[in-house]
From Swiss-Prot:
SUPFAM superfamilies: D-aminoacid aminotransferase-like PLP-dependent enzymes (SSF56752)
Residue list for modification N6-(pyridoxal phosphate)lysine: 154
Name of the protein in question: Probable branched-chain-amino-acid aminotransferase
Family, per entry: Belongs to the class-IV pyridoxal-phosphate-dependent aminotransferase family.
């Protein structure tokens, strides 16, 4: 996609410049391309405003710092760059992708000459592919322990396993994979956080072994404001059969019903989506004003 609805060129913000879509390229020897040394965010703009932009931007900078990357712009400058990009591309509802990466000055693992670069891209929000809900299977791949990879950094390296797991799920006829942590407890889906419901109580894994999603945090806040109890616990795979409902949360999908999870010896079906639907509606009110 290279043009917007008014047939003007799309632009991507790169290191302080608005670059036409077709010219927004990187060198073949880009360090982060070879070593996954980049961090990014996934954001949504509604009616021309990015939801929780400050929180996303602060997390972007923090993610970079965890990897030892010094972002050459402060939070306020990155926020203003978002606003400039949205105005330039004349879009209201969009998916936003900020990225911080190392340049092509060296292929050494560590080199003080490596530059740190920033881009922000915005494309129109795509129609939701799983409006009717989706079906999961349990991936054979486990999340790395927090002392192996920094889980609160939204690093490209984390997504190697996510890609592998989701591809396997798709090949087997499922929509996505449920990931377990290094001890076998439920963690998350490949790119989203997961919630379960029983007796009007929300259960969700403790977010110390995976990225604590901003949408996840928002849904917990909404649920508590509605008077719902939320329990963050270590959840075992066999507990899935005890729940009546399941849903996933994420910037791109917002709140998405999960219809079933194949746990190996059986498929657990979820038919009661009433609480998820209420949370979905309330979330929509907040993000769309």
């Amino acid at each position: 996609m290279t043009k917007n609805s008014e047939n003007n060129l799309w632009y991507i913000w790169i290191n302080g410049e608005l670059v036409p879509y077709e010219l927004a390229t990187v060198h073949a020897l880009t360090h982060s391309l070879h070593y996954s040394g980049s961090v990014f965010e996934g954001e949504r703009a509604y009616n021309g405003k990015v939801f929780k932009l400050k929180e996303h931007t602060e997390r972007l900078v923090k993610s970079a710092e965890v990897l030892g990357l010094k972002v050459p712009y402060n939070v306020e400058e990155i926020i203003k760059a978002h606003e400039l990009l949205i105005e330039k591309n004349k879009i209201q509802d969009a998916y936003i992708r900020p990225l911080v990466w190392c340049g092509s000055e060296s292929l050494n693992i560590i080199n003080p000459k490596l530059s740190t670069n920033v881009l922000i891209a915005a494309v129109p929000s795509m129609p939701r592919a799983f409006a009717a809900g989706f079906n999961l299977y349990v991936s054979r791949w486990r999340k790395a322990a927090p002392n192996m990879m920094p889980v609160q950094s939204k690093s490209a390296a984390h997504y190697n396993m996510a890609i592998t797991s989701k591809k396997e799920a798709k090949d087997l006829g499922y929509d996505d994979a449920l990931l377990l942590d290094y001890e076998g407890y439920i963690a998350e889906c490949t790119t989203t956080n997961i919630f379960f419901v029983k007796d009007n109580v929300l259960y969700t894994p403790i977010a110390d072994r995976f990225l604590d999603g901003i949408t996840r945090q928002t849904i917990i806040e909404i649920a508590k404001n509605l008077g719902l109890e939320v329990k963050e616990e270590r959840l075992k795979l066999e507990q899935i059969e005890d729940f009546i409902s399941c849903f996933a949360t994420g910037t791109a999908i917002e709140v998405q019903n999960i219809n079933s999870i194949d746990i190996g010896n059986k498929k657990v079906i979820f038919n009661d989506h009433k609480i998820a639907d209420v949370l979905k509606e309330e979330y929509g009110k907040i993000v769309r004003g």
